Amino acid sequence: MAASLSELSTYLGERLIGRVNDADIAYGELTMHVEPRNLIEVVTFLRDDQRCQFISIIDVCGADYPSRPKRFDVVYHLLSPKQNVRIRLKVQADEETMVPSITGVFPGADWFERETYDLYGVLFSGHPDLRRLLTDYGFEGHPLRKDFPLTGFVEVRYDDEAKRVIYEPVELKQEFRNFDFLSPWEGTDYVLPGDEKAKTN
């Protein structure tokens, strides 16, 4: 498997000169880093080339690295059923950089790109319907960004008296507690405050 991935990496490096920044093989998967301006050309080649035949899009997802100038990785997972090989493409972007939509090449990427936009705020140029998919219409922010607060900004609940959904500021019912366990791998064999009331066998 590693030999075939290495051969594929060499082949793609020769065929996509200047369009792929670099490629590496890790954990049995080939990853190629691509600039946004080259994405459509690379994806089209991977789909149409007779040796590759990556005809199935598995997923499009995001990753957030706030310390980088281009904080987002948009990651494309493609499958070649004929070759029984997967490939991963990574494109870096920031809040303003628009990544070209690949829905013209893979129509199935439509909701994957909407999900990435909704959860990370990555913008896709040329997308036919770039709007939120998983969060509510009036939702503020993008919940999978590392700088998004754990509690969110508002609390949404259905009010039975008003017979509608209402939005309220987040109200924590108890103060934040930090549990200090000696070892998360061993479990606790000591009594924490309040546990002395519990029966132990």
Swiss-Prot record:
It is found in: Cell inner membrane. SUPFAM superfamilies: Nqo5-like. Disulfide bonds: none annotated. The keyword Cell membrane applies. GO terms for cellular component: plasma membrane. Keywords: Cell inner membrane, Cell membrane, Membrane, NAD, Quinone, Translocase, Transport, Ubiquinone. It catalyses: a quinone + NADH + 5 H(+)(in) = a quinol + NAD(+) + 4 H(+)(out). Its EC number is 7.1.1.-. It is a peripheral membrane protein. One of its GO terms (molecular function) is quinone binding. InterPro entries: NADH_DH_suC (IPR010218), NADH_quin_OxRdtase_su_C/D-like (IPR037232), NADH_UbQ_OxRdtase_30kDa_su (IPR001268), NADH_UbQ_OxRdtase_CS (IPR020396). Gene3D superfamilies: NADH:ubiquinone oxidoreductase, 30kDa subunit (3.30.460.80). The keyword NAD applies. NDH-1 is composed of 14 different subunits. Subunits NuoB, C, D, E, F, and G constitute the peripheral sector of the complex. PANTHER family: NADH DEHYDROGENASE [UBIQUINONE] IRON-SULFUR PROTEIN 3, MITOCHONDRIAL, NADH DEHYDROGENASE UBIQUINONE IRON-SULFUR PROTEIN 3. Belongs to the complex I 30 kDa subunit family. NDH-1 shuttles electrons from NADH, via FMN and iron-sulfur (Fe-S) centers, to quinones in the respiratory chain. The immediate electron acceptor for the enzyme in this species is believed to be ubiquinone. Couples the redox reaction to proton translocation (for every two electrons transferred, four hydrogen ions are translocated across the cytoplasmic membrane), and thus conserves the redox energy in a proton gradient. This is NADH-quinone oxidoreductase subunit C. It comes from Mesorhizobium japonicum (strain LMG 29417 / CECT 9101 / MAFF 303099). The lineage of its organism: Bacteria, Pseudomonadati, Pseudomonadota, Alphaproteobacteria, Hyphomicrobiales.
